[in-house]
């Protein structure tokens, strides 16, 4: 396990230095990860919603949000406030308990996944040794909430949307997990920190996208399907199902689905950046930069600069992938449900299995290049 920045230890030690007891410091830490996670995820969503509106407008030769704040940057905030004050309506024949639990079960695992994703040089809330497995386990809870919402709404369109969403999620969960296993096999670890560190040796040439091109394509297609982005937005196909499992939702319950969708998109882009694009690593290795300037890697100003650049690089890679996902929305037509399931079960799953076996063979044959 890499011994980098530990937010928990640093936070508790800072409070102890201020004169608080260790027990009180640990108690004060308990709500901190959740608050930090919610703030980071919410800010990421606001930026993503604004980007989607502006990119969509550009694709359609419109201006987009312009007058709500500078360049319309306050438009996403206005959307959120509008939903906050909307009436929360529960259909007369719906199951009130399941109807309320559905959005919560969908939203909570997405937020919890941010606990194990690094935003910079070892800057992670919880550096778990099984971080990737935890994320896969959390993401597999979502279909239960989607089915619950579709069933509890007592609406045929909602039920069909929930069934489609569950089928889609299950179909693409397996290829996604196999693609991640190939990366974990090369990195000899399931920790997100260790996976990024393993890509740090040769700059851009050391990133996993070059050693796992098939895995990268499989993972990117699978996360787009998991996020229900076009061309895989069949659970919400307006022409067929009105709004799918969200049809009967209003107010804050609908806002939870809206929020979870964009939080999941940012999270998926972050994970692609971490697993395949070197995370916080810059295209040029730090060793090369320090040699150019003739300074030691342990020089404080170089370490601070490198840590700051790491956060910037992570966000740049993440929002580049968000940009591509938004652009795909206006580029590709929606696939049919049979095409969607055929792609997952008959193409991505066999290719993901072949990719995993190929990775194992290359790891044994060329251990230096494939993390042996």
From Swiss-Prot:
GO CC, alphabetical: plasma membrane-derived thylakoid membrane
Enzyme superclass (EC): translocase
Catalytic activity annotation: a plastoquinone + NADH + (n+1) H(+)(in) = a plastoquinol + NAD(+) + n H(+)(out); a plastoquinone + NADPH + (n+1) H(+)(in) = a plastoquinol + NADP(+) + n H(+)(out)
Pfam families, A to Z: NADHdh
Main location per the UniProt record: membrane
Record GO biological process: aerobic respiration; photosynthesis, light reaction
Superkingdom as given in the UniProt entry: Bacteria
Signal peptide: none
Gene Ontology molecular functions: NADH dehydrogenase activity; oxidoreductase activity, acting on NAD(P)H, quinone or similar compound as acceptor; quinone binding
E.C. number(s) listed in UniProt: 7.1.1.-
Cell compartments where the protein resides: Cellular thylakoid membrane
NCBIfam families linked to this entry: PRK06076.1-2, PRK06076.1-5
Subunit structure: NDH-1 is composed of at least 11 different subunits.
Physiological role: NDH-1 shuttles electrons from an unknown electron donor, via FMN and iron-sulfur (Fe-S) centers, to quinones in the respiratory and/or the photosynthetic chain. The immediate electron acceptor for the enzyme in this species is believed to be plastoquinone. Couples the redox reaction to proton translocation, and thus conserves the redox energy in a proton gradient.
HAMAP family for the chain: NDH1_NuoH
Name of the protein: NAD(P)H-quinone oxidoreductase subunit 1
Gene: ndhA
């Amino acid at each position: 396990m890499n011994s980098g920045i530990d937010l928990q230890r640093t936070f508790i030690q800072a409070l102890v230095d201020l004169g608080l007891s260790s027990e009180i410091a640990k108690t004060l830490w308990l709500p901190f990860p959740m608050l930090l996670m919610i703030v980071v995820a919410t800010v990421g969503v606001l930026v993503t919603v604004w980007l989607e509106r502006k990119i969509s407008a550009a694709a359609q030769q419109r201006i987009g949000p312009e007058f709500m704040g500078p360049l319309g940057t306050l438009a996403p905030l206005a959307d959120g406030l509008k939903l906050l004050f909307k009436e929360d309506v529960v259909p007369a024949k719906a199951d009130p308990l399941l109807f309320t639990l559905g959005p919560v079960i969908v939203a909570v695992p997405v937020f919890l996944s941010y606990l194990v994703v690094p935003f910079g040089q070892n800057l992670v809330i919880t550096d778990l040794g099984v971080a990737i497995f935890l994320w896969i386990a959390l993401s597999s809870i979502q279909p239960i909430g989607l089915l619950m919402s579709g069933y509890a709404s007592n609406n045929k369109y909602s039920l069909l949307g929930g069934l489609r969403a569950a089928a889609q999620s299950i179909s693409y969960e397996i290829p996604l997990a196999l693609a991640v296993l190939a990366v974990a096999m090369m990195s000899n670890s399931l920790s997100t920190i260790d996976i990024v560190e393993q890509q740090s040796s040769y700059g851009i040439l050391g990133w996993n996208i070059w050693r796992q091109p098939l895995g990268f394509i499989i993972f990117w297609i699978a996360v787009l399907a998991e996020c229900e982005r076009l061309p895989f937005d069949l659970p919400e196909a307006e022409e067929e199902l009105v709004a799918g499992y969200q049809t009967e939702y209003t107010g804050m319950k609908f806002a939870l689905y809206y929020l979870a969708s964009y939080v999941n998109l940012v999270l998926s882009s972050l994970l692609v950046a971490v697993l395949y694009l070197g995370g916080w690593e810059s295209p040029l290795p730090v060793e090369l930069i320090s040699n150019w300037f003739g300074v030691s890697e342990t020089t404080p100003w170089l370490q601070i600069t490198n840590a700051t650049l790491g956060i910037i690089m992570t966000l740049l890679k993440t929002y580049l992938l968000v940009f591509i996902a938004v652009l795909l929305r206006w580029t590709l037509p929606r696939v049919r449900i049979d095409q969607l399931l055929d792609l997952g079960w008959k193409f991505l799953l066999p290719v993901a299995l072949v990719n995993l076996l190929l990775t194992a063979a290359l790891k044994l044959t060329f251990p230096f290049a494939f993390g042996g």
